[in-house]
From Swiss-Prot:
SUPFAM superfamilies: NIF3 (NGG1p interacting factor 3)-like (SSF102705)
Molecular function per GO: metal ion binding
Keyword terms of this UniProt record: Metal-binding
Protein name from the UniProt record: GTP cyclohydrolase 1 type 2 homolog
GO cellular component: cytoplasm
InterPro entries associated with the record: DUF34/NIF3 (IPR002678), DUF34/NIF3_sf (IPR036069)
Binding residues for a divalent metal cation 2: H66, H230, E234
């Protein structure tokens, strides 16, 4: 059975901390280096629900994509929700390790996992990492479809293949337009529009798209935009990371039991569609 320090060394080889953005907070948050690890849980968010899931599972290590403390704090009191997470982890001898922007740009990384979930063929990074001479690392991925789809069909595929959320998939653009090439980026993606336009793709699937960036992007060209829930676009990475750690465990004879969280931590819990006619309450006259 490996020690935590050995497992962390393996995770750091997959997602080196030095490749994280300067503002990010990655690495081991809680954990005793010499503690033994037999069971690991991967999740998107280090929130109480996933920590409780780790406790119930008997996990020794929780690996999350999002940081617990992205900004500094002066307290880990259990009266705060993040402090309660820390207390629960320590009381149950569960370590917490975070791989965030260093997993976004990895090869394979968050957007590779998203592309794989949608059966897209990855061509190259959307925003290449200049430090990678092979040009395989970077933010987002430019992809090709094996067979053309309409925007509507691509959105339906995303709704079917990604974890279900209240939001589903929002679309901007002609639903019947043909899509042969797609850019994808797990997590917030509306800062990447210049790169998407430069890539010359037919569609862009990401999360957290806002009104003004979408309006301006649509004014530039007829690019189709597909907006999924942030959590849903990053959850496939949990399966990828778990598979990678499984392979490492087998290679070293660690016999780790690696699990992927099924807890939905997307903060949106319901969706009510607008009335279809202009006579709906609140519609313009």
């Amino acid at each position: 059975m490996p020690r935590l320090s050995e497992v962390i060394t393996a995770l750091d080889a997959l997602w080196p901390a030095e490749r994280a953005e300067s503002w990010d907070a990655v690495g081991t948050v809680v954990g005793e280096p010499d503690q033994e690890v037999s069971r690991v849980l991967f999740a998107v968010d280090p929130v109480q629900e996933t920590v409780d899931e780790a406790v119930g599972l008997g996990a020794d290590l929780l690996v999350t994509h999002h940081p617990l403390y992205l900004r500094g704090t002066t307290t880990v009191a259990a009266s705060t929700f993040k402090g309660r997470v820390v207390h629960t982890l320590i009381k149950n001898d569960i370590a917490l390790h975070v791989a965030h922007t260093n997993a976004d740009t990895a090869d394979p990384g968050v957007s590779d996992a998203l592309a794989g979930a949608l059966d897209l063929n990855v061509v190259r990074p959307l925003v290449p990492d200049p430090s990678d001479p092979e040009g395989r690392r970077g933010l987002g991925r430019v992809c090709e479809l094996t067979h053309p789809l309409t925007v509507r069909e691509l959105a339906a595929r995303a709704a079917e293949r990604l974890p279900a959320t209240a939001q589903g998939i929002r679309v901007a653009g002609d639903p019947e337009a043909t899509v042969r090439t797609v850019a994808v980026s797990g997590g917030s993606g509306d800062s990447l529009f210049d790169h998407v336009r430069a890539a010359g793709v037919d569609a862009f699937l990401t999360a957290d798209l806002r009104h003004h960036p979408v309006s301006e992007a649509r004014a530039h060209n007829p690019l189709a935009l597909l907006d999924a829930a942030h959590w849903a676009t990053e959850w496939p990475w949990c399966e990828l990371g778990a598979a990678q750690l499984d392979e490492i465990s087998d290679r070293h004879g660690w016999d780790l039991r690696v699990h992927v969280s099924k807890t939905v931590t997307d903060p949106w819990t319901a969706h009510v569609a607008s009335a279809p006619t202009s006579s709906a309450m609140g519609a313009p006259n």
